[in-house]
Amino acid sequence: MRNRLWAVSLALVLCASPLLAQNGYDFSRFKTETWRFIQKPAHWKGDDWLKAGLVCAGSVILAATVDKSVSDWGFRHPKYDNSVPIVIGEIWGGPFSPPLVFGFFAVHSWLTGSETSRKISFEIVQAVVYTVPTTFLIKVAVGRARPKEDRGVDYFRPFSKDSLLHFNYQSFPGGHISMSVAISTVLAKNARPWWLKTVAYLPTALTMASRIYQNKHWTSDVFCGAALGHFIGDWIVAQHRKAGPASGAHGFSIQPYFGGSSFGLIASLPL
């Protein structure tokens, strides 16, 4: 069911993407950058391998040291399962937030002609298209049982029917986490002030907490998913920093406004 929801989310985003077919943000560019993304691991350099190695090492260390104790704590304290922060975290990392975020910036771009909104919308599409299958492939390759299966931290069914078809054996890495971090990274990289960059990551922090607290994932699953989402989101934004129409976009910003007896916030999206 969950994988079908992600498929629907992906379809909605892709169907709406013709809104972006202006100023170079079209299928041709998407196809070129997607092929570049697929080829990227074959062209990794020393620092790329170092990052991957550190993430793997960190995941192993967390699995060996804190996964079980954190999971046990969550099982013993379930009373906040339906609390507002946990629910917000679940929604932000779920399949409904990407179409909503994409739709907001796509509609704003369509109404105002904002190049920045168009760029962000395009990058949200890429974040979904790249993150979902990448995460799923790793899940199938690892086949780790979720905490709620009660099989322990070291139960794996790699490249098996279970890991391919059964949600309960797709724990590593965290899919909600990788998707939420990828989207938050895209938003943060396009924001100007540091505090707005921080705000972009706040719902992701709730997603991480909710997945661990509800025993949907081990701590190491969340760590690896967050790293994966960050690397993908960062790579996407970097493609548009190098060249092309996005190079003139300077990001969106929100500033406080005070004037006479009125005050509020002003959102700025360069045209």
Language-model features: where?
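Alpha-helical transmembrane segments
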Residues: 52-56
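Alpha-helical transmembrane segments of multi-pass membrane proteins
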Residues: 59-68
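Juxtamembrane helix-capping/reentrant segments at transmembrane boundaries
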Residues: 79-92
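Interfacial/capping segments of alpha-helical transmembrane domains
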Residues: 67-77
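Well-ordered alpha-helical segments within folded domains of soluble proteins
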Residues: 58, 101-105
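Hydrophobic transmembrane alpha-helices of multi-pass, membrane-embedded glycosylation machinery
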Residues: 105-106, 205
